[in-house]
Amino acid sequence: FMKPTTDFPFLLDNPRAWRTYLGGRMLDALHGDSNGEDGHFPEEWILSTVAARNAGREQFPEEGMSHLRGTDVTLKSVLESDTEGYLGKGAAQPTLGVLTKLIDSAERLTLQVHPDKPTALRLFQSQYGKTECWHILSGHPVNGEEPCIYYGFQPDMTRARWEALFHAQDIPGMLAGMQKYPVHP
C-alpha cells in the first residue's frame, strides 16, 4: 500500500451492499437512473471502513467498503496507514469502525438488536458494537404503512412475553410490543 499523495478531500466510490430485503430504486434515481428497480442492493454505503457480513457472500470480502474513487484502495487502509495524521491524536484508535449509508427500503426492515462492543465481541467475535442515528431524507408507504421507526419496548412488555413472541415468530405481536414513531423528512 502506498499512501495517497492527494490532498483532502478523498473522492470515494459509492458501494452498494447486498441485503435480504428489497429496495434501491430511489438510490438509482438519485444517481440519474430513472429506470432503476428495487432489488437486493438497497443500501449505498457512502462512507465505510467496515465490510458487509452476509452469509453466502464470503467471496466479496470488501463488499460495502469505501474505496478511493477509481482504485482498489480502501478508505480503511488509507486511514490505517497514518491514523493519527488523518484523524488527529485524540481520535486515533487501533480499530476504526465507521459506516454512513443511504437506505431505500421497499419493505419493512427486520427487527434488530444492536449489541454494545463487549457483547459484539463475546457473541460475534467482532470489535464493533453498533450505535446508530438516523436522518430521514424521504419516505414512502410500505405495504400500506406510512414511514415509521419501531424503537424500544412498550412500557408493559416483559422479557418472558417478548421471548414467547420471539420463539413463536409472532411478528405482529412483536411490532405491537414496540414503540412506533412516525417519521417525516
Question: What role is predicted for each listed range?
Answer:
Residues 1-157:
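Transition-metal
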